[in-house]
Amino acid sequence: MKAIAVEPGAGTPTLIDLPVPEPAPGEALVRTLRVGVDGTDDEVIAGAHGGVPDGDDRLVLGHEAVGVVEDANGTDLEEGQYVVPTVRRPPPGVETNVYFERGEPDMAPEGEYVERGIVGAHGFMAEYFTSPADCLVPISADLAPVGFLVEPISITEKAIEHAAATRSAFDWRPESVFVLGNGSLGLLTAAMFRTTMGYDRVYCLGRRDRPHPSIDILDELGVTYIDSRETPVPEVPEVYEPMDLVYEATGYAKHAFESIEALAPNGVAALLGVPNDWSFEVDGGRLHREMVLHNKAIVGSVNSNRDQFASAVDTLAGLPSWVIEDVVSGVYGLEEYERAFSDPTDDATADDDTTIKTAVEFSNI
């Protein structure tokens, strides 16, 4: 079978041949339909994040997948059933651990998990993959063409759930929401806040010039676009309004601290971006004081569990179809898989790029 893999330091993915995997007891064989590409894939390809499986010299990419059960292999799944795989698995040689037993692999610390297509385990960018049946979340046939969006939406499901949990000790009624980042994850999240969650006052930060497809989506949704070059995050409360909930999806390290200043009293910021090391000065005393005197909170969030995947399926079904169509910039077959990935040699900057979300198609739906 064909697969898309990367070798450490290579900087570009390649198409390779691998044998079709054999499902172990409790596993199903899945025929891959489509696999999404996101910023994590770019980081893995660049060697800035992740790692190959033990004893291997390359990593099969892909963690945002949708497929169809080819061989149920005695599990409760049915052949022909559409499924989306979760990402985390126990480390090699470990059948399970307390985090997986609790159904909370997303809360496992480093060393207690591997992530398919990211670190320590091959991903889903292959014509077939195997997976434990309990790591496969059913999805309807009508959602299968965009099922690769379930994983990123599940990331937001968890972040919102955990942010709300920090406010559960009192009667918290958020009205204003601020999404930092107008990439694919930020756009999907802004769409969730406006449509399936029903927020009226939603703002989204970016640094792109009009016209741009991402800003067009925000305008159509009724989300206020804020250009960070004109209004930096700390100035947002004065120019617009203080925010009850800030959702950070930029990976820009200063935003972790600036989010505190953007929050309204009793607000919470959820941080999802993963920045590189960066030293800079902050007024720690002022930020500490802001959090204490105004009951503010910050929560970090990574990965998601099966329940959040299931919620993401429902959310995806509730999003307007036009949003999905506009977010997905292109789906490319194996003969042109390179087009789905960012080109590190391209002179065009991210600000000029009109691509929002891409995917590789391995099999017709």
UniProtKB/Swiss-Prot annotation:
TM ranges: none
Molecular-function annotations in GO: D-glucose binding; glucose 1-dehydrogenase (NAD+) activity; glucose 1-dehydrogenase (NADP+) activity; NAD+ binding; NADP+ binding; zinc ion binding
Family matches, as InterPro entries: ADH-like_N, Glc_1-DH_arc, Glu_dehyd_C, GroES-like_sf, NAD(P)-bd_dom_sf
Zinc is among the record's keywords: yes
Residues annotated as binding substrate: T40, E115, E151, N303
Residues where NADP(+) binds: N182, G183, S184, L185, R207, R208, L272, G273, V274, S301, V302, N303
Enzyme class: oxidoreductase
Reaction(s) catalysed by this chain's protein: D-glucose + NAD(+) = D-glucono-1,5-lactone + NADH + H(+); D-glucose + NADP(+) = D-glucono-1,5-lactone + NADPH + H(+)
Full protein name: Glucose 1-dehydrogenase 1
Protein's organism: Haloterrigena turkmenica (strain ATCC 51198 / DSM 5511 / JCM 9101 / NCIMB 13204 / VKM B-1734 / 4k) (Halococcus turkmenicus)
